Amino acid sequence: MLHPRARTMLLLSLPAVAIGIASSLILIVVMKIASVLQNLLWQRLPGTLGIAQDSPLWIIGVLTLTGIAVGLVIRFSQGHAGPDPACEPLIGAPVPPSALPGLIVALILGLAGGVSLGPEHPIMTVNIALAVAIGARLLPRVNRMEWTILASAGTIGALFGTPVAAALIFSQTLNGSSEVPLWDRLFAPLMAAAAGALTTGLFFHPHFSLPIAHYGQMEMTDILSGAIVAAIAIAAGMVAVWCLPRLHAMMHQMKNPVLVLGIGGFILGILGVIGGPVSLFKGLDEMQQMVANQAFSTSDYFLLAVIKLAALVVAAASGFRGGRIFPAVFVGVALGLMLHEHVPAVPAAITVSCAILGIVLVVTRDGWLSLFMAAVVVPNTTLLPLLCIVMLPAWLLLAGKPMMMVNRPKQQPPHDNV
């Protein structure tokens, strides 16, 4: 016979697995549609018209039209395509289901059009809203917070292809007690995360790791080098933190989202022309291309880091629907490669992983997620102790500092983005 604690944990197991699978399938469908549209916009259409896909006019035109299209969706869709991600944390309160169609369309347009944002925030919003709405009907005795936790865990597992990130994130939020141990509370979320990760793995494998030279043995000087790299990444990230709310306030004085996003898309197009095609899109595939290109110099990596960070700020400030984690990882990789080229004595494994740790920490203010992203992009167990040590001064530097988020005006309704 199972102990009552075990039976309690099993109660939500089936819903957790179902939510994890559904979270992954929603992500897969959205990404597939966006991929097809991206191929149409950036491969087939310019080829048919006899235009180079890296033509400045094409890049500016596609991104400007993408901004206008997203603005029209936000202006006229029911629920205005959900909340502005610049004003929301990664895991937020559930939104009305009526806002989800517009949010999904806005996300797909942004991903396909080359906007420098990832899918994580809108997908999280969609999955949480559906889990809460459907779960409240099927199992009304389960509170909204439980459904929110299961949906966010399933989404994290699906996004990263592993339940490890969910385990790390929720271990700091689901505090255990003498009555309910931590792992009792983690059981159902980890079931959802595992189901999401396994479902994603059936269709594609998220490819985060980079072909960077193996790091052999940790030296004391490497800790100092890593801390300096993380501090440089944090300094760059804090510039973006300072710029985001100011640019957001300036752009949204125009009130009309079509105009705001059209201008935002035009600026992104100009940045894309300067940085080239590798500086477009969410950044995961592009960072693989960046590492594979042996022709890039220190100044090239610096330019890519600056352009991508600027594009991230512009996209978020304009109101495009997307997340900031994936493009931030690209910025970290570019910064790390730049610093390694500048000081070759410091291994690239250290510069890249510590730069990712610093910039993701600025964007998310989540130590576990920052460690996870650094560890999966540069998968080397020898680096783990160094990253844990470097995290300490990095966390001190950011203590009490503002987050990369815009404070929503009090008079503005929570989901009215007109």
From Swiss-Prot:
**Higher taxonomy:** Bacteria, Pseudomonadati, Pseudomonadota, Gammaproteobacteria, Enterobacterales
What Gene3D superfamilies does this protein map onto? Answer: Clc chloride channel
Gene expressing this chain: yfeO
Q: What pairs make up the disulfide bonds?
A: none
For this UniProt record, give its keywords in alphabetical order, as a comma-separated list: Cell membrane, Ion channel, Ion transport, Membrane, Transmembrane, Transmembrane helix, Transport
Recorded superkingdom: Bacteria
Question: Where, per UniProt, does this protein localize?
Answer: Cell membrane
* UniProt main location, coarse: membrane
Q: What is this protein called?
A: Putative ion-transport protein YfeO
- Please name the GO terms that the record assigns under molecular function: chloride transmembrane transporter activity; monoatomic ion channel activity
Q: Which HAMAP family match?
A: CLC_YfeO
